[in-house]
Curated annotation (Swiss-Prot):
This is Probable cytosol aminopeptidase. The lineage of its organism: Bacteria, Pseudomonadati, Pseudomonadota, Gammaproteobacteria, Pasteurellales. Its cofactor is Mn(2+). InterPro entries: Leucine_aapep/pepB, Macro_dom-like, Peptidase_M17_C, Peptidase_M17_leu_NH2_pept, Peptidase_M17_N. PROSITE patterns: CYTOSOL_AP (PS00631). One of its GO terms (molecular function) is metalloaminopeptidase activity. The keyword Hydrolase applies. The keyword Protease applies. Belongs to the peptidase M17 family. Presumably involved in the processing and regular turnover of intracellular proteins. Catalyzes the removal of unsubstituted N-terminal amino acids from various peptides.
């Protein structure tokens, strides 16, 4: 899809003009102009009750006298001054549905005239594009009959300000990153294993002059003492690989990097502490943290942000086997702390703790890890907010700001010293689980023991990384949040 922002005349020929109308006869400038061009036809529709402005209600008019456009699509925008982000998304989706049904190829949108609460024109355009791209997404790689794709080729926003051009640039890059994350996450685990994840990182690096890649294999992990990471991998025939993508693009090449770490369990059966069979197929999504880091690295490379960023994809697989690690095992982590394994299904933190130690070598400005870490986070926050844990208030606030800006929502959970009490073990420095209560927090507390040398935040995306049921599939979250956070570091 090609997106443009330019001033257009309502008399211009096109497949379709999209126009918004508020309730209570609140009309935009363009509505009044088209009404004049069509000799009061739109006002007649309002008087007859056919045009109400009700939220996301659409009416499609064809071949109007006085209008060069083949079609005029009018969409209701609710009450003026009360339109929320969620309602705006419903409007864009309603418009897209009609455009698809009518095989429209090119559109000029005057929805740039509608007002959103606490949002500007930049956001109006960017969110429209991201919504269109997200809604149009299809994953039919393995279907013999492919889904019908939209024929829509051109979408023009009626404005030519610099803000609009930046919105298109940001939206295109973020949408590309989200699609990449969704594609990898939706791949079946018999194909998407740790080696596949490393291969995708290689392809990304080869297609960007600013990206380079280092892959750490099991032999190197053993030399480094990454015993917790390796223990998780022991039950699988698929070897672990940690892919380190480096984006060196800051004006000061010696600037400390921002490090993103993504949990990449390409399949998690739970190991010896086997998960229930129901919905176990969804455990291919246990690598969505790595997928989101991959997507974010793709987005910032496309944007060419003047930053130094390192993205680590911690690829691994957790399966039961005669060689698998066991409850009761004691592991010596890379930083020397010992961990008693009480549950092999609490494996993500074991992979992450060694990865978080590994990234110390980069002397990072800050580190953000992203992981589908705990079911407890889903119980606490549901599927709308990612859980945020951090030892740094400024970093946490910056991430929450990015979450608000993008509507890729997050909610901060507490992290006080008391939670460390639940991680005590009579036999080792730490236990890998903290009991029944506050599981999302104690998982974060566990990780905090391996992040003493830098500013750190943890995003638990177990509830937000994928959907279930009829709309089953990866969401691509939190690529938008992470990319916005990085954009904000440039400002």
């Amino acid at each position: 899809m090609k997106y443009q922002a330019k001033n257009t005349a309502l008399s211009q020929a096109t497949d379709c003009i999209v126009l918004g109308i508020y309730e209570n006869n609140k009309f935009s400038k363009s509505f009044n102009e088209i009404d004049q061009l069509t000799q009061g036809y739109l006002n007649d529709l309002v008087k007859s009750g056919e045009l109400t402005g009700k939220l996301a209600q659409t009416i499609l008019l064809r071949d109007l006298q006085g209008l060069s456009a083949k079609r005029l699509l009018i969409v209701g925008c609710g009450k003026k001054g009360e339109l929320t982000e969620r309602q705006y998304k419903q409007i864009i989706q309603a418009v897209l549905k009609t455009l698809k049904e009518t095989n429209t190829r090119e559109v000029i949108s005057y929805l740039t005239e509608i007002e959103l609460k606490d949002r500007d024109l930049y956001w109006n355009i960017r969110f429209a594009i991201e919504t269109i791209e997200h809604t149009n997404y299809q994953f039919d790689h393995f279907k013999s009959q492919k889904a019908e794709t939209s024929v829509l080729e051109s979408f023009v926003f009626n404005t030519d300000c610099n803000q609009a051009q930046q919105a298109i640039s940001h939206a295109n890059a973020i949408s590309s990153g989200i699609k990449a994350a969704r594609d990898i996450a939706n791949m079946p685990p018999n194909i998407c294993n740790p080696a596949y994840l490393a291969e995708q990182a290689k392809n990304l690096a080869e297609n960007s002059t600013a990206l380079s890649l280092k892959v750490v294999d099991e032999e190197e992990m053993a030399k480094l003492g990454m015993n917790a990471y390796l223990a998780v991998s022991k039950g699988s025939e698929n070897r672990a690989y940690m892919s380190v993508l480096t984006f060196n693009n800051a004006l000061d090449k010696n600037a400390k990097p921002i490090v993103l770490v993504g949990k990449g369990l390409t399949f998690d059966a739970g190991g010896i502490s086997l998960k229930p069979a129901a919905d176990m197929d969804e455990m291919k999504y246990d690598m969505c943290g790595a997928a989101s880091v991959f997507g974010t690295m793709k987005a910032i490379a496309q944007l060419n942000l003047p930053l130094n960023v390192i993205g680590v994809l911690a690829g691994c697989e957790n399966l039961p086997d005669g060689n698998a690690y066991r409850p009761g095992d004691i592991l010596t982590t890379m930083n020397g702390l010992t961990v008693e394994v009480l549950n092999t299904d609490a494996e993500g933190r074991l992979v992450l703790c060694d990865t978080l130690t590994y990234v110390e070598r980069f002397e990072p400005e800050l580190v953000i890890d992203v992981a589908t870490l705990t079911g407890a986070c889903v119980v606490a926050l549901g599927q709308h907010n990612s859980g945020l844990v951090s030892t740094d208030n400024n970093l946490a606030n910056a991430l929450l700001q990015a979450a608000t800006e993008t509507t890729d929502k997050a909610w901060r959970l507490p992290l006080s010293e008391e939670y460390q009490e639940q991680l005590k073990s009579p036999f080792a420095d730490l236990a890998n689980i903290g009991g029944r209560w506050g599981g999302a927090i104690t998982a974060g507390a566990f990780l905090s023991n391996f992040t003493k040398k830098y500013r750190w935040a943890h995003l638990d995306i177990a509830g937000t990384a994928w959907l279930q049921g009829a709309n089953k599939g990866a969401t691509g979250r939190p690529v938008s949040l992470l990319t916005q956070f990085l954009i904000n570091q440039v400002k």
